[in-house]
Design a protein with these regions (language model features):
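Accessory regions outside conserved functional cores
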Residues: 2, 19, 35-39
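Sec/Tat signal peptide C-region and signal peptidase I cleavage site
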Residues: 26-32
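A residue-level signal for beta-strand positions that form part of recognition/binding surfaces
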Residues: 29, 104, 108, 142, ...
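Periplasmic peptidoglycan-binding/tethering modules of Gram-negative envelope proteins
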Residues: 35-142, 215-221
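Periplasmic OmpA-like peptidoglycan-binding domain that tethers envelope proteins to the cell wall
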Residues: 148-221
Length: 221
């Protein structure tokens, strides 16, 4: 009788433990999904980040006009529509210098393991990017789509992976949102430009940066 009671008691305890583990797993999955949602940028956030700051009218400056650096404009025209793998090391560095003071946003876009395929949890961010770049306020500008990795893995491997992933984002935007491919320049930097150099393996380093190269000084009325 006692043994039977002990067996039933043990069975009940195991059942409770199993239920607890299941609930914990479900809660963990739900929290992971919520965290992924929190990291996805909205269309509005992207639009605000990539829209050049409005500046007051000055003498000789009409609404919507801006003064572009001729050399900068020439370089932008040279790289328009280029794919990441077609860029030389010098061109990559020139792009990095060009975009320093331009409107930009870092998107935490994840990809399937060892792949350039966009993960399902990051699709909302890429779709929001597509809608933002389709907005009339941004149409006509040339954008840099730059892929970055963390410090894990070899230099050449990360360089290749970052290029393929940047090109994957461009392909998605062109095919799904009809963005003009000439308005998108893809570039990969591998592990060469860490966002958080103090923590080279940090998730923040694995990102896609989008930059509006035509930082137009749109004058406000």
């Amino acid at each position: 009788m006692l043994k039977c009671f002990e067996f039933k008691n043990l069975t009940s305890m195991l059942s409770i433990a199993t239920i607890g583990a299941t609930l914990s797993l479900g809660l963990g999955t739900a929290l992971a999904e919520e965290t992924a949602k929190d990291k996805n940028a909205s269309e509005g956030e992207i639009l605000r980040a990539l829209t050049p700051e409005k500046k007051p009218l000055t003498r000789g400056l009409s609404v919507g006009s801006y003064r572009a650096d001729p050399a900068e404009s020439q370089f932008v025209q040279k790289i328009r529509g280029r794919l990441a793998r077609s860029l030389s090391v010098n061109e990559r560095e020139e792009i990095a210098n060009l975009v320093k003071d331009k409107p930009k946003i870092d998107l935490e876009i994840t990809f399937n393991y060892n792949s350039a395929e966009i993960s399902s949890k990051s699709l909302p961010s890429v779709e929001a990017l597509g809608r933002a770049l389709s907005n009339s306020d941004l149409k006509g500008s040339t954008f840099v789509v730059a892929g970055h990795t963390d410090a894990a893995g070899g230099e050449s491997y990360n360089q290749d992976l970052s290029e393929r992933r940047a090109d994957s984002i461009k392909r998605f935007l062109v095919e799904k949102y009809g963005i003009n491919g000439m308005d998108l320049v893809t570039v990969g930097y591998g592990r060469g430009k860490l966002k958080d150099p103090n923590q080279p393996m940090a998730e923040a380093n694995r990102r896609v940066q989008v930059v509006n190269t035509e930082n137009k000084a749109i004058a406000s009325k």
